[in-house]
Every structure is written in structure tokens, then in C-alpha cells.
Amino acid sequence: MAALRMRIQLNGESFELPDGETVAALLARLDLAGRRVAVELNLDIVPRSQHADTTLNDGDNVEVVHAIGGG
């Protein structure tokens, strides 16, 4: 039996994930785990301390912004 899938909007693009994926798992999938990022879920900022406990749902809008050093 195939795993159920959901679609979210990630930085304005359609993105498919397994049902029940957390913000932390999404960041790991994007190779952003442990990096300095800001995550917005449906217009609300998700604190880093809540990434592992915040489950994504079908149709969610997620924006991920990561800091890039410069100077």
C-alpha cells in the first residue's frame, strides 16, 4: 500500500510530501536542518523550538528563508 501524500505550497511552488511530515522533517529533506532559517506556516512564524512538533497539512502555505552570510 502506497504512503499517503499531501501537497503544500513551498515558497510559492507546489511540493509533495508524505502525510504527517513535520517542519523539521521538511527542513531535513531540503538539506536545511541545523541551518539558520525562518519558517512561516500559513502566515505565522514557527519558532525553531516547535519545528519538530509542528505537523504540516495538505494545502498549507510554507515559506522558508535561510540566512546567507555576506559582507
Predicted features along the sequence, with ranges:
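Ubiquitin-like/PB1-type beta-grasp interaction modules and other compact soluble beta-rich domains
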Residues: 1-70
